[in-house]
């Protein structure tokens, strides 16, 4: 499942983060990938343990905790600290698939990368190119969102970032482990949850809505690993 989550950050939060990032020291993005990824990656990133990046990442994670659409879709269990990248002057990232397991910096924990998240920190009109292309069974999907919006998609997806030919594309990106590893089951739960919410808004907590809510939680209880 691929999902656009609007307004994760407010304009004020985006402005604050951009001011801090514009003054930060960036490094070659190849330093954070393996040999295969380094062959197709050309961008810049903040170092994984950058104090600025870690502080700004907490702003993003706190915003997501209060986002019901994100929680319903992702059913998050564990996060990688958000990272930050910048593309300009023709920089790009060719087709690749994210690594399946990552170590969480500064801890002894690892996570399985079930979902990938890209949060846009610049407006689409600020740069040319730079589209995120995600390929799945149904073809290639082009993503270029307003500042503060996020795209959520399975980490098993082949994806790339097109060359940026004007301006700069600045984003945060990170991975998470979901309580429900299987994307099809997670998608089913999300669709069920959204339909329950719509029915509840129309009908209130009638017997049928309560029953469907029970089915949702029983499925989640059966499939979740916590």
Swiss-Prot record:
Fe cation binds at residues 96, 98, 159. GO terms for biological process: DNA damage response; intracellular iron ion homeostasis. The keyword Disulfide bond does not apply. This is PKHD-type hydroxylase mma_3620. The keyword Membrane does not apply. GO terms for molecular function: 2-oxoglutarate-dependent dioxygenase activity; iron ion binding; L-ascorbic acid binding. Its cofactor is Fe(2+); L-ascorbate. Binds 1 Fe(2+) ion per subunit. InterPro entries: Oxoglu/Fe-dep_dioxygenase_dom, PKHD_C, PKHD_hydroxylase, Pro_4_hyd_alph, Pro_4_hyd_alph_FE2OG_OXY. 2-oxoglutarate binds at residue 169. It is an enzyme of class 1 (oxidoreductase). Pfam families: 2OG-FeII_Oxy_3 (PF13640), PKHD_C (PF18331).
């Amino acid at each position: 499942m691929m999902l656009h989550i609007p307004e994760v950050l407010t304009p004020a939060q985006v402005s604050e983060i951009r001011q801090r990032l514009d003054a930060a020291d960036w490094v070659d993005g190849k330093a954070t990938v393996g040999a295969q990824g380094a062959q197709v990656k050309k961008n810049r990133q903040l170092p994984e343990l950058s104090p600025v990046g870690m502080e700004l990442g907490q702003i993003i994670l706190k915003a997501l905790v209060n986002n019901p659409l994100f929680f319903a879709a992702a059913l998050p269990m564990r996060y990688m600290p958000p990272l930050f990248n910048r593309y300009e002057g023709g920089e790009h990232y060719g087709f690749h698939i994210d690594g399946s397991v990552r170590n969480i910096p500064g801890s002894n924990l690892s996570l399985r990368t079930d979902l990938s998240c890209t949060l846009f920190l610049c407006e689409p009109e600020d740069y040319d190119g730079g589209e995120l292309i995600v390929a799945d069974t149904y073809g290639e999907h082009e993503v270029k969102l307003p500042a503060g919006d996020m795209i959520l998609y399975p980490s098993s997806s082949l994806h790339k970032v097109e060359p940026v030919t004007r301006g700069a594309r600045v984003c945060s990106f990170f991975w998470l482990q979901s309580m429900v590893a299987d994307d099809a089951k997670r998608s089913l739960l999300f669709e069920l949850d959204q339909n329950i919410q719509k029915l509840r808004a129309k009908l209130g907590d009638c017997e049928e809505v309560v029953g469907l809510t029970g089915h949702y939680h029983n499925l989640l209880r059966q499939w979740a690993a916590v």
